[in-house]
């Protein structure tokens, strides 16, 4: 593979994470406007976004096998067509069923693209470089989380219809589409058998289970928190939508900066120990945010939370890939799928909590999930295989 093609494929990976980040994170900003558009309570409206998360989960799960059957390039081109259909559905269709179908299509496109992006990074890069590349790739999720809430808040403040926010997000896929047409992709499945190394079957071990559950709890906790921050800030502290959007953007700015910094720092630490420390600090930072009565402190706490939690998810995935001597794409996809289950469950879990006990209770639940991540990471120390496989970095 020549270097220019590798760079194009790497940028496809970056944009795939940005696309998923934009679709998932912008929900908290536009949800109130969409609920008003369809004349529904916001707690009921949140349930329809489960279609987005379900699409992501199903496509990531199935694509572990479909990547070996349908060429990656064809999948991405088809994804572009689906993206156009979904955006057109939001603009032309004015009923809840078409909205739900469009959200599901967004999820399918996002999941396919993200799973391909993750595979490309793990396929093209080895060893320490893989972990730092995954972390940098994941930072584009955060970058989208920084840019699109601000853009969405600006559009909504100017009374521009909410569906134009999704049209703006669609521009990311235009970039993916153009790069796809110019790139050559790795060949998977039977056609690649002759060129591939013999597959070494290894038992994953109980450590993978701990990592998978931690990934689920982390994503569910993170999204369960960040999706309700705008509603919490506007209703509890009487902030306007721009101020609430700025809180969300502050989180993702800090998250992105943290990813860039930790991509250099992590190589000097044992991954299991550092992720345990980061999970503890993130739990504390979220507790301070949820507990404070002073709105002036919210920005400080959410900045701290974004920074210390930035490396947790990617480190969990990297630790998973190090549980076997030979990295297993299916193992990585399994942990990624479990994280996506957390995405899908976001409104399934938090929607009823908000309806029955209020937004603050949903944020407290998210804090409890972060505590669970800390406990799982601590327990992982007794089961992890990355040290015995010689994967410890110094």
Curated annotation (Swiss-Prot):
It comes from the Bacteria. It holds the Pfam family MFS_1. It is found in: Cell inner membrane. Keywords: Cell inner membrane, Cell membrane, Membrane, Transmembrane, Transmembrane helix. GO terms for molecular function: transmembrane transporter activity. It is a multi-pass membrane protein. GO terms for cellular component: plasma membrane. The keyword Protease does not apply. SUPFAM superfamilies: MFS general substrate transporter (SSF103473). The chain crosses the membrane at residues 11-31, 51-71, 76-96, 101-121, 134-154, 162-182, 206-226, 246-266, 274-294, 302-322, 334-354, 363-383. Belongs to the major facilitator superfamily. TsgA family. HAMAP family: MFS_TsgA. NCBIfam families: PRK03699.1 (NF002982). This is Protein TsgA homolog. It comes from Yersinia pestis. The gene is tsgA.
């Amino acid at each position: 593979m020549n270097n220019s093609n590798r760079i194009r494929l790497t940028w496809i990976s970056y944009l795939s994470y940005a696309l998923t980040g934009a679709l998932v994170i912008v929900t908290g900003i536009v949800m109130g406007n969409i609920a008003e558009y369809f004349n529904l309570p916001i707690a009921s409206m949140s349930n329809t976004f489960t279609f987005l998360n379900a699409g992501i989960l199903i496509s990531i799960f199935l694509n572990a096998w479909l990547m070996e059957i349908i060429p990656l390039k064809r999948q991405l081109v088809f994804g572009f067509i689906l993206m156009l259909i979904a955006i057109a559905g939001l603009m032309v269709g004015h009923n809840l069923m078409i909205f739900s179908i469009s959200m599901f299509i967004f999820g399918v496109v996002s999941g396919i693209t993200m799973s391909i992006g993750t595979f490309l990074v793990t396929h093209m890069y080895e060893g320490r470089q893989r972990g730092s590349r995954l972390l940098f790739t994941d930072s584009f999720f955060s970058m989208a989380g920084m840019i699109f809430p601000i853009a969405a808040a600006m559009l909504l403040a100017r009374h521009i219809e909410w569906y134009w926010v999704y049209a703006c997000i669609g521009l990311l896929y235009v970039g993916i589409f153009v790069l796809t047409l110019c790139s050559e992709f790795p060949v998977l499945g039977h056609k690649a058998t002759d060129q591939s190394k013999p597959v070494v079957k290894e038992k994953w071990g109980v450590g993978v289970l701990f990592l998978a559950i931690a990934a689920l709890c982390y994503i569910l906790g993170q999204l369960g928190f960040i999706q309700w921050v705008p509603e919490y800030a506007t209703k509890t502290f009487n902030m306007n939508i721009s101020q609430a959007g700025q809180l969300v953007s502050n989180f993702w700015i800090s998250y992105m900066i943290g990813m860039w910094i930790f991509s250099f720092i992590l190589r000097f630490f044992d991954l299991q120990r550092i992720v345990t420390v980061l999970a503890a600090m993130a739990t504390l930072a979220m507790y301070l945010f949820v507990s404070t009565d002073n709105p002036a402190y919210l920005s400080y706490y959410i900045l701290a939370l974004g920074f210390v939690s930035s490396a947790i998810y990617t480190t969990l995935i990297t630790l998973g890939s190090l549980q076997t001597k030979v990295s297993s794409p299916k193992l990585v996809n399994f942990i990624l799928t479990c994280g996506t289950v957390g995405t899908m469950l976001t409104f399934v879990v938090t929607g009823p909590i908000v309806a029955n006990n209020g937004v603050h209770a949903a944020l407290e639940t998210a804090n409890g999930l972060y505590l669970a991540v800390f406990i799982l990471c601590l327990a992982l120390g007794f089961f992890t295989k990355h040290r015995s496989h010689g994967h410890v970095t110094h």
